[in-house]
C-alpha cells in the first residue's frame, strides 16, 4: 500500500533540478497510496560513488521541504547536468515500523549505501532473513521488513566477489535475492556498483514501466521485437517505473504492465525482461532465467483526469463527476432499437461466458470495503433476474475460512484498483477450485483483470481520492447491467428489464439533479460538526447505501458511524437511541417503504434526532409522527435507487470533513490501493 517510482534518463542532458522535480511529482501522483513518510535517492556527481539519500516522516511536501533545506545547507548544485542518471522514490503507508526517517524508503544495505531498495508489499519471512543476516555481521537500523532486501543484496554481492571468477551482474544479484523472499512485493533496486542501471521486479504487487523516446514522436504502435526491446543504442530515452499509471501519464503513454515473477533490467538505453521458470519466481543459484517477449500498450488516460481542475479536493471533483462517469460506464453497452424495438445490454467481455454463468449453481460476489457494498447493493436484482442464488463474501474472510467454492460456481471479484491483496488471494483460491472467475475493475491491465477468465471494465475514469465515490456508483451500474445480461433470455422479465434500461439511460440526469443538494448537505454537516457518532438505517436495496454512507463518514470525517440493517433495529441498536444521537434513515419508495415508515415512528417514539432521506413529495408523510429533517431525492427504479441515495451521503461526508478540518483526500491511516494484507 505504498507508492514506488523511478526515473532513468539515457543520453539525455537533464539538470539535477529537473530530476528532483520528476521524482517529487511522481510521488505526488502516488501520494494517495500512502503519505506518512517518503524518500528519494539520486546520483552523486560521480555515479560510481555513494548516492544521495533523503528520507523524511510526513507527506511529500515535508520531504520536498527537507530536501530543499539540505540543498541550501550543503550547496548542492541543482544546475549540474547528467547525461545518464538513475533515481528512485517512495511514499509510504506504514505496515512495519512507525512513520520515521529510519523506517522510510529507500532502505539501505548499510554504510556506503551499496544497495538501495524501494518496496511496495510485505515480506512475510523477513524475521528469518534478518536473523540470518545478523549472524553474518549485519546490523539493522529500521523496524521495516524491507531492510532485509538491500542487506541481502549486499550479502549476495560480497559473497559472489569473494568466490572470485566472473563478476556478478546486477540481475544475478537480484535473482538470488528473490529466491529467498516470501510474500508480496514490487521492488526497484539501485546500486552504485552498477551505475546508470536499475532493476525492477514484482510478485503480487503492481508495477508498470513507461518509455519515452526523446528523438521520436510518441508512437502508439511500437512493439518490442524481442526480450531486449528498445535494444542498446544511442537514442536519448527516459524510463519510468511506477506503482500505477497516474504517475506516468504526464510523461508518456507507452507502458508495459510488469507481470508476476518478471525482472526488468534498465541498462545502456535498453530494456530486458527476464522471468523465472520455477514456481513463485524461484531459481537455483546465480542463474539467468529465460527472456520474455513483451509489447508496449497505450495508456488510455489524460493528464486532466488526474488534476483537481476547478475543485478544491479530488473527492469533491469525483462526486460531481458522477453524471459523466456513469455515462461513460454505460456508453456502447445499452442498445435500444432493432427490428423489434427491443432494449438490450451488451457486455463484450462477458458475451462468450453468459451461458456458463446462467448454468451456475450460485454466483459468489467477493470484494472489500466499498466494492463489497456495491455488490451488496446489486444482489437483489441479480437474484431477481437470474434466478440464481447470490452469496456475498468479504475477501479476507473467505480466504481465512477457506470457504467452499465449487466448479459449478461463478465467482465475481469486484475491486476499483484491481490490485486489492485480499481479493487477489481469494481469486487465486477460486481459480484453484475450478470456478469461473469474473473481474469487475476500474483499471485495465490490473492483476484481477489479467487473472480472471472474463470481466467488465467500469470505465469510471481515474479516481484519486482515497474515499471511493464515482467508482462505487459505476460498479453498481455495471452489476445491474450484468443482471440484465444474465436474465436476457427470460421472456417473463422483459418488461422489467426494459424499464431498468430506460432508468439507466436517465440515471446521469437524475444524479445531476441530486447534486443540487450540495448546499443543503453542507448546512446539515454544519449541524453535525461536533457530533461523535452517527447511525444510518437502511433496508432492502438501501442496506448497502447505509453501510456505504456510514463508511464514507467514518473514512474521511473520522466520526464513528455505523450502517445498520433496519430489520435488526430491535435486536440491539434501538438501545443506543436517545435525544442526542443523530440518526439517518433511508426511506425512499420501494418494497420496503412501509417498513421504513414503521422504523421512523419507533425512532420518533424514543425521541431520536432523525434525518430522513425520502422520495420527492414524501417529506410530509415521513415526518408525520414527529419532527425530522427530510432530504428529498428523485425516485428511480428500485435497483438504481442506491446510486441516487448515496450521493447526498457522499456530499455530507465531504462537507463534514472540510468543516472538521481534516484532510479529505488523505484520511488518517488509510491509503487508496490496499495491496497488502
Curated annotation (Swiss-Prot):
<comment type="function">
    <text>Controls the flux of glucose into the hexosamine biosynthetic pathway (HBP) leading to glucosamine (GlcN) content homeostasis. Involved in regulating the availability of precursors for N- and O-linked glycosylation of proteins. Required during pollen maturation and pollen tube formation by triggering polar deposition of pectin and callose in the pollen cell wall. Promotes tolerance to tunicamycin (Tm), an inhibitor of proteins N-glycosylation in endoplasmic reticulum (ER).</text>
</comment>
<dbReference type="GO" id="GO:0072720">
    <property type="term" value="P:response to dithiothreitol"/>
</dbReference>
<dbReference type="GO" id="GO:0034976">
    <property type="term" value="P:response to endoplasmic reticulum stress"/>
</dbReference>
<feature type="binding site">
    <location>
        <begin position="370"/>
        <end position="371"/>
    </location>
    <ligand>
        <name>substrate</name>
    </ligand>
</feature>
<dbReference type="GO" id="GO:0006487">
    <property type="term" value="P:protein N-linked glycosylation"/>
</dbReference>
<dbReference type="InterPro" id="IPR017932">
    <property type="entry name" value="GATase_2_dom"/>
</dbReference>
<dbReference type="InterPro" id="IPR035466">
    <property type="entry name" value="GlmS/AgaS_SIS"/>
</dbReference>
<dbReference type="GO" id="GO:0006048">
    <property type="term" value="P:UDP-N-acetylglucosamine biosynthetic process"/>
</dbReference>
<keyword id="KW-0032">Aminotransferase</keyword>
<dbReference type="Pfam" id="PF13522">
    <property type="entry name" value="GATase_6"/>
</dbReference>
<dbReference type="InterPro" id="IPR001347">
    <property type="entry name" value="SIS_dom"/>
</dbReference>
<feature type="binding site">
    <location>
        <position position="571"/>
    </location>
    <ligand>
        <name>substrate</name>
    </ligand>
</feature>
<feature type="binding site">
    <location>
        <begin position="415"/>
        <end position="417"/>
    </location>
    <ligand>
        <name>substrate</name>
    </ligand>
</feature>
<dbReference type="InterPro" id="IPR029055">
    <property type="entry name" value="Ntn_hydrolases_N"/>
</dbReference>
<feature type="binding site">
    <location>
        <position position="420"/>
    </location>
    <ligand>
        <name>substrate</name>
    </ligand>
</feature>
<keyword id="KW-0808">Transferase</keyword>
<dbReference type="InterPro" id="IPR035490">
    <property type="entry name" value="GlmS/FrlB_SIS"/>
</dbReference>
<feature type="domain" description="SIS 2">
    <location>
        <begin position="524"/>
        <end position="667"/>
    </location>
</feature>
<comment type="pathway">
    <text>Nucleotide-sugar biosynthesis; UDP-N-acetyl-alpha-D-glucosamine biosynthesis; alpha-D-glucosamine 6-phosphate from D-fructose 6-phosphate: step 1/1.</text>
</comment>
<dbReference type="InterPro" id="IPR047084">
    <property type="entry name" value="GFAT_N"/>
</dbReference>
<dbReference type="GO" id="GO:0010208">
    <property type="term" value="P:pollen wall assembly"/>
</dbReference>
<keyword id="KW-0315">Glutamine amidotransferase</keyword>
<protein>
    <recommendedName>
        <fullName>Glutamine--fructose-6-phosphate aminotransferase [isomerizing] 1</fullName>
        <ecNumber>2.6.1.16</ecNumber>
    </recommendedName>
</protein>
<dbReference type="Pfam" id="PF01380">
    <property type="entry name" value="SIS"/>
</dbReference>
<dbReference type="InterPro" id="IPR005855">
    <property type="entry name" value="GFAT"/>
</dbReference>
<keyword id="KW-0119">Carbohydrate metabolism</keyword>
<dbReference type="GO" id="GO:0097367">
    <property type="term" value="F:carbohydrate derivative binding"/>
</dbReference>
<feature type="active site" description="Nucleophile">
    <location>
        <position position="2"/>
    </location>
</feature>
<dbReference type="GO" id="GO:0006541">
    <property type="term" value="P:glutamine metabolic process"/>
</dbReference>
<dbReference type="InterPro" id="IPR046348">
    <property type="entry name" value="SIS_dom_sf"/>
</dbReference>
<feature type="domain" description="SIS 1">
    <location>
        <begin position="353"/>
        <end position="492"/>
    </location>
</feature>
<dbReference type="GO" id="GO:0004360">
    <property type="term" value="F:glutamine-fructose-6-phosphate transaminase (isomerizing) activity"/>
</dbReference>
<dbReference type="GO" id="GO:0006047">
    <property type="term" value="P:UDP-N-acetylglucosamine metabolic process"/>
</dbReference>
<feature type="domain" description="Glutamine amidotransferase type-2">
    <location>
        <begin position="2"/>
        <end position="269"/>
    </location>
</feature>
<keyword id="KW-0677">Repeat</keyword>
<comment type="subunit">
    <text>Homotetramer, may also exist as homodimers.</text>
</comment>
